[in-house]
Regions:
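Conserved hydrophobic/amphipathic alpha-helical signal-anchor segments
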Residues: 31-74
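N-terminal single-pass transmembrane signal-anchor helix
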Residues: 1-37, 41, 48
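Periplasmic/extracellular, small/polar-rich flexible segments of pilin-like filament-forming proteins
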Residues: 57-168
């Protein structure tokens, strides 16, 4: 009679190998999950930038969210919108500048603490005639939050203004 099966040592080796793989893979998995959740931020900011750009060219001024036609992801609420992972907050225009768009984490995402923020300061440069003005931007993020969204800073490449301050 022929016996088939695995020896105890073979099973233990397989269990040890699976344990090592799990120890390496689990932290990476959580990092990837946090980055995928945070990927919503650059997408929402990019939509806002496109709408604000069009409004500035047409109106020669910065516009509020309602004027430019922007609605943050999620359910509209006072001063912005509320999504599952982020609050999106509208800023105030002062002298054609301001931090007019913010995202605030509703939960901890890796090194980005709960209530960590991403912000987008907006200003105007150019002439006073219609179509001569351009919006300029500056991005900022709370400690640990920017690392989750490397594409957030790239949204404004070529249109950065060092004179703007991002108020988080």
């Amino acid at each position: 009679m022929k016996k088939q099966g695995f020896t105890l040592i073979e099973l233990m080796v397989v269990i040890v190998i699976m344990g090592i793989l799990a120890a390496v893979a689990v932290p990476k998995l959580f990092g990837m999950i946090a980055k995928s959740k945070a990927s919503e931020v650059p997408t929402a900011a990019g939509t806002y930038i496109n709408l604000q750009d069009a409004y500035v060219v047409e109106a020669n001024a910065l516009g509020t969210w309602s004027k430019v036609g922007y609605t943050g992801p999620g359910t509209s609420s006072a001063g912005g919108s509320e999504g599952g992972i982020f609050y999106y907050l509208e800023g105030t225009i002062s002298s054609n500048t301001g931090t007019l768009w913010k995202a605030q984490a509703r939960q901890k995402l890796n090194e980005c603490n709960k209530d960590g923020k991403w912000g987008l300061a907006v200003g105007i440069q150019g002439g006073e005639a219609e179509g001569q003005s351009n919006a300029v931007y500056k991005t900022g993020a709370s400690t640990g939050c920017g690392d989750l969204t490397p594409s957030f800073d790239k949204l404004t490449s070529g249109r950065n203004s060092t004179g703007l301050t991002v108020s988080l």
